[in-house]
Amino acid sequence: MLSVILKSSVRGLGKAGEIAKVRPGYARYLLADGKAVRATKDNVALLEQKLALIEEENSKKLAEAEGVAKSLGAERLIIVRQSSDDGKLFGSVTVRDVSKLLCDLGYDIQPRCVSFSEVIKRTGEYEINVELHADLVAALQLHVVRNESEAERVRLGIAKSEDQAAAAAEVEQAEDVAAAEQQDSSPVDDHADDADGATGGEGRDEGAGDASDGEEMPST
């Protein structure tokens, strides 16, 4: 096992600035990819000096990844593949296919960052995972269809669902505003109620007194 200092966070291994022990083959990959340096005495000393800078850089990369995740969530991921009438694909959809789709949409996502929970060998809707950062994995919906006509129907269906969700949100917001305005326009004044009750009580007492004064004493 070799000790390396991680220059950036690696999922399942550690965060930027940490020292990790890995097999020689994996160490060569990390070194070549610029994700780590050898944990020599000099590098460890240098790490201690630059640790704050490394953590700041990692936070910056995480913020960028969160922005990419939000943007990806708005994309409609559709792959067209030939299939039989029952939906069985002539082949399968691979992580490379998804990586190419994302790259075509303007995202630099390598195949190693894509994963599926199941092998995609039929048309349908699937959840895929895209690792954008060691601390952030985006779960996306992938639609696999047999032709462009079906792809267009999927696009229209997604758009309709989004419109319905937006309309429902607007209605809910309007109802909340109306309820708040109604509550503001009819305040409950507890002091006024107490005052009215006290006045009413005094009126009743005075009336009772007047009635008593007006009664005649029975003659004997």
UniProtKB/Swiss-Prot annotation:
Record-linked Pfam families: Ribosomal_L9_C, Ribosomal_L9_N
UniProt keywords, alphabetically: Ribonucleoprotein, Ribosomal protein, RNA-binding, rRNA-binding
UniProt GO molecular function: rRNA binding; structural constituent of ribosome
Region of interest (Disordered), ranges: 167-220
GO cellular component: ribonucleoprotein complex; ribosome
GO biological process: translation
Biased composition, class Low complexity, residue ranges: 167-184
InterPro entries: Ribosomal_bL9, Ribosomal_bL9/RNase_H1_N, Ribosomal_bL9_bac/chp, Ribosomal_bL9_C, Ribosomal_bL9_C_sf, Ribosomal_bL9_N, Ribosomal_bL9_N_sf
The keyword Ribonucleoprotein is annotated on this UniProt entry: yes
Keyword Ribosomal protein recorded: yes
Family indicated by similarity: Belongs to the bacterial ribosomal protein bL9 family.
Task performed by this protein: Binds to the 23S rRNA.
HAMAP family registered for this protein in UniProt: Ribosomal_bL9 (MF_00503)
Entry protein name: Large ribosomal subunit protein bL9
Organism of derivation: Anaplasma marginale (strain St. Maries)
Gene designation: rplI
